[in-house]
Structures are given as C-alpha cells and as structure tokens.
C-alpha cells in the first residue's frame, strides 16, 4: 500500500480550559521519532493499554514509524462534541505526516461550540472560577515560549482521591437546599 507512517488519533479529558488552543500529546515507542517531534506536550502519562499501543509497538518493530496524537479536551465538555479537538488533530496529522488534511466545516463548528460554551460558563460563577484556574495552570506551563511545548508536571495535577475529597468538602460547606 506504500504506507510510510502509522498515525493514530484520539482524545482524552484533561485539566485544560476551552479558552486556549487545544494541546496535543504524542505517544510513540520510537525514541528517534520522539526526539524529532517538536511542539507537542511532553511528559509521562500512565493510561490504560489499548490497540493503538499494540499497533505502535509492532509498526516500530517492523521499521515503520508510528505514533499517536491525542487531543486534550477540557474535562467539563468531554461528553459533548468538541470540534476544536478534531481540528487540532487534523492539523497535527498534517504536520507529522506532511499531508494536506481537509478541514471542511470544522473551524466554523469549533467557533460556534466555543460561543456556546462561553455562554454556559458565563451563567455560573463557579464555572467561571474553574475556567480561570485552568487558564492560569495552562498559561504557567506555556510561559517558556512557543519554540516547543512545555513538559507538563503531571505531579501537580490532583489525584482522583484528592479531587473527590475536595468535592466532598465543597458539598459539605453548601447550605442545605430543599
């Protein structure tokens, strides 16, 4: 088939705001390919195994470059369509594979979705505060400049247990409502 590279595309919920560009993470079992890629989030992230990992490892063993591009979707919108992630993935695919990826209606859909999310967030002060905190978190990580994406310190992200404890404390402090 003349295949010269295998690229898997996916997305995952992340502690990022919808008000910033979608960050892409890259996964690969090839050290050389990892060293050659610039502009992607670097770091170690433990995730459940999946078919993409098997394809990546086997393709690299066969001498075929393989990687996965993963869009970081704001966790608070991860259950709804998020065209900005699809757009970022297409742009990332075009970048790593050296192809022209047709974007179609995605840019307009992403803009319309952004407006709708802005409206929803504006209706709730707690949501506004959360988005502001996420903006600060992401902006601190990106402060080193646009030359290459930063290494995000995943140790600074609260664990599931810490988030659950914080949520329980928040709920305890709320006045009882009938």
Each model region followed by its residue ranges:
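Accessory terminal and edge-of-domain segments that mediate assembly/interaction
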Residues: 1-5, 13-178
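Acidic-aromatic/histidine active-site loop/patch
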Residues: 10
């Amino acid at each position: 088939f003349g295949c010269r590279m295998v690229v898997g595309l996916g997305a995952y919920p992340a502690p990022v705001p919808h008000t910033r560009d979608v960050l892409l993470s890259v996964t690969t079992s090839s050290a050389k390919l990892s060293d050659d890629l610039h502009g992607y989030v670097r770091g170690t992230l433990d995730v459940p195994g999946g078919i993409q990992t098997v394809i990546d490892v086997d393709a690299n063993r066969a001498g075929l470059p393989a990687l996965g591009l993963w869009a970081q979707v704001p966790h608070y919108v991860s259950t709804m369509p998020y065209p900005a992630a699809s757009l970022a993935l297409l742009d990332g695919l075009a970048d790593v594979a050296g192809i022209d990826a047709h974007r179609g209606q995605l840019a307009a859909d992403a803009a319309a979705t952004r407006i709708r999310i802005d409206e929803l967030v504006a209706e709730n002060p707690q949501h506004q505060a959360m988005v502001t905190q996420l903006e600060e978190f992401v902006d601190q990580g990106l402060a080193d400049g646009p030359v290459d994406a930063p290494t995000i310190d995943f140790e600074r992200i609260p664990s599931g247990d810490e988030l659950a404890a914080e949520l329980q404390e928040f709920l305890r402090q709320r006045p009882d409502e009938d």
